[in-house]
Amino acid sequence: MKISVSKNDLENALRYLQAFLDKKDASSIASHIHLEVIKEKLFLKASDSDIGLKSYIFTQSSDKEGVGTINGKKFLDIISCLKDSNIILETKDDSLAIKQNKSSFKLPMFDADEFPEFPVIDPKVSIEVNAPFLVDAFKKIAPVIEQTSHKRELAGILMQFDQKHQTLSVVGTDTKRLSYTQLEKISIHSTEEDISCILPKRALLEILKLFYENFSFKSDGMLAVIENEMHTFFTKLIDGNYPDYQKILPKEYISSFTLGKEEFKESIKLCSSLSSTIKLTLEKNNALFESLDSEHSETAKTSVEIEKGLDIEKAFHLGVNAKFFLEALNALGTTQFVLRCNEPSSPFLIQESLDEKQSHLNAKISTLMMPITL
């Protein structure tokens, strides 16, 4: 193998691949990136037993095709230090030489045949994603998921495919809150009418870096493969049964309040400077915010005027986690939001105002949250 490649193109590709390397054991083949030159393309692969990525860049010139491997971390360390001009990569015996002008490096290779093959699946479900709504849903629900949850099933995001109605439900929870959305008019091809899979949060975070729109998603129930023109990504799925979240959602709410999103965000941020929990009081023409701190005498208070007034006879009090409330508001694509409540001790719902239009490219997220006991 002997090629010339753009320094910037190679460095960008290597940065994407770092998350897929085994950096603890340099003797493992999983610490290496697999390189293969085919015609005018350099294909790069990195994988451990759970997750993997294959990408390619165009070569500037290709004198000889071939394969090789190289320690992924050291490869990036070298390339990032070089100047912004073409780089020569050449395999010699059991080493890979890296050259640019008067600088040269040589790193040992492993046997490329020992590199694990990328999986080929027989999909039970597949979709073509031509707009950013799915990635938008992933991005907004990701903060709710605990990667280290003691319940394995909850350490990922649920994707629930309904072929009959052509809908995809996306759900995440940490048991204290639950965020969900239903994406409609999805072209689902499935061997079963209803099928679901749980993507690990680690995979979810990498998907957000690699994909936006114009990609395919396929799953055989054990693995998921996501692919676009530049990248092929695979991940093992979480094996388990996700809780039936529909049973958790209240059938109805006693009260429903339409409120200003930005005013609430500013007020919560002010009070959360002293405490992570806040007492929210809703009155006919005001929303009052007060920090809750049982250990110190520190307090923070602020209020927001509600111009249109609320249909409420007496003050309604609610204890909320400031961080959770802010993340729920940040997931909304409208300037107003709806707060749906029952008793102060019961879960409450935050969702977008149905009267306000938003971009059809955005996912409409609803978040059910447990209150803080006052």
From Swiss-Prot:
The keyword RNA-binding does not apply. GO terms for biological process: DNA strand elongation involved in DNA replication. Keywords: Cytoplasm, DNA replication, DNA-binding, DNA-directed DNA polymerase, Nucleotidyltransferase, Transferase. It comes from the Bacteria. SUPFAM superfamilies: DNA clamp (SSF55979). GO terms for cellular component: cytoplasm; DNA polymerase III complex. The keyword Magnesium does not apply. InterPro entries: DNA_clamp_sf (IPR046938), DNA_polIII_beta (IPR001001), DNA_polIII_beta_C (IPR022635), DNA_polIII_beta_cen (IPR022637), DNA_polIII_beta_N (IPR022634). GO terms for molecular function: 3'-5' exonuclease activity; DNA binding; DNA-directed DNA polymerase activity; identical protein binding. It is found in: Cytoplasm. Its main location: cytoplasm. Disulfide bonds: none annotated. Confers DNA tethering and processivity to DNA polymerases and other proteins. Acts as a clamp, forming a ring around DNA (a reaction catalyzed by the clamp-loading complex) which diffuses in an ATP-independent manner freely and bidirectionally along dsDNA. Initially characterized for its ability to contact the catalytic subunit of DNA polymerase III (Pol III), a complex, multichain enzyme responsible for most of the replicative synthesis in bacteria; Pol III exhibits 3'-5' exonuclease proofreading activity. Forms a ring-shaped head-to-tail homodimer around DNA which binds and tethers DNA polymerases and other proteins to the DNA. The DNA replisome complex has a single clamp-loading complex (3 tau and 1 each of delta, delta', psi and chi subunits) which binds 3 Pol III cores (1 core on the leading strand and 2 on the lagging strand) each with a beta sliding clamp dimer. Additional proteins in the replisome are other copies of gamma, psi and chi, Ssb, DNA helicase and RNA primase. Belongs to the beta sliding clamp family. PANTHER family: BETA SLIDING CLAMP (PTHR30478:SF0), DNA POLYMERASE III SUBUNIT BETA (PTHR30478). This is Beta sliding clamp.
